[in-house]
Amino acid sequence: MAGARRLELGEALALGSGWRHACHALLYAPDPGMLFGRIPLRYAILMQMRFDGRLGFPGGFVDTQDRSLEDGLNRELREELGEAAAAFRVERTDYRSSHVGSGPRVVAHFYAKRLTLEELLAVEAGATRAKDHGLEVLGLVRVPLYTLRDGVGGLPTFLENSFIGSAREQLLEALQDLGLLQSGSISGLKIPAHH
């Protein structure tokens, strides 16, 4: 990831008190739906439009009162997504990666949690009633996992948006590693260079 150095979780947790930890989660669910009756959706993946106009994943900074990274992440998910986020819990087994950037002393931890489609739909339905809606979070968006016939519409165009930090790279890595796209789809994408 551009400008970021990957750390093992143990190394990240041993950095000491001068470091802040931020945790974010990619929430996804299998989706049997079809766009226009012919384009398979495959999975629903949630991202959010942030207060700064950039796309990112739900989550935030872990506070000192949180007993673990996951406790802090689950608290943040309830604040940003609403009470439907209390129906599931992101666990250590959902952990994907940790990165530090060249800027402030912040470690970014990334998780991916598979939900049922019903759980994901409940999160979407309740998100506008969440504590942080309209403040830190301006709304949820789904990631289009298809490419239209023009070769540009869908995921390639979505990737042209402005993303916070490493969110774009985390998304692409998760799509590939979790098998959320059809085999070979990422290598065949006309992915514009990161702005």
From Swiss-Prot:
A single cellular component GO annotation: cytoplasm
pH dependence: Gradually increased from pH 6.5 to 8.5 in its IDP hydrolyzing activity.
Top-level class of the enzyme under EC nomenclature: hydrolase
Temperature dependence: Exhibited a temperature-dependent increase in its IDP hydrolyzing activity up to 60 degrees Celsius.
RNA-binding found in the keyword field: yes
PROSITE patterns noted in UniProt: NUDIX (PS51462)
Cystine pairs: none
Cofactor: Mg(2+); Mn(2+); Co(2+)
Ligand binding (Mn(2+) 3): 76, 80
Main location (coarse class): nucleus
Residues annotated as domain Nudix hydrolase: 18-173
GO molecular function per UniProt: 5'-(N(7)-methylguanosine 5'-triphospho)-[mRNA] hydrolase activity; chloride ion binding; cobalt ion binding; dIDP phosphatase activity; dITP diphosphatase activity; identical protein binding; IDP phosphatase activity; magnesium ion binding
Keywords from the named record: Cytoplasm, Hydrolase, Magnesium, Manganese, Metal-binding, Nucleotide metabolism, Nucleotide-binding, Nucleus, RNA-binding
Tissue occurrence: Expressed strongly in lung, kidney, adrenal gland, testis, heart and brain.
Domain of life: Eukaryota
GO biological process, one term: NAD-cap decapping
PANTHER family, alphabetized: NUDIX T16 FAMILY MEMBER, U8 SNORNA-DECAPPING ENZYME
Record family assignment: Belongs to the Nudix hydrolase family. NUDT16 subfamily.
Protein name: U8 snoRNA-decapping enzyme
Organism, scientific name: Homo sapiens
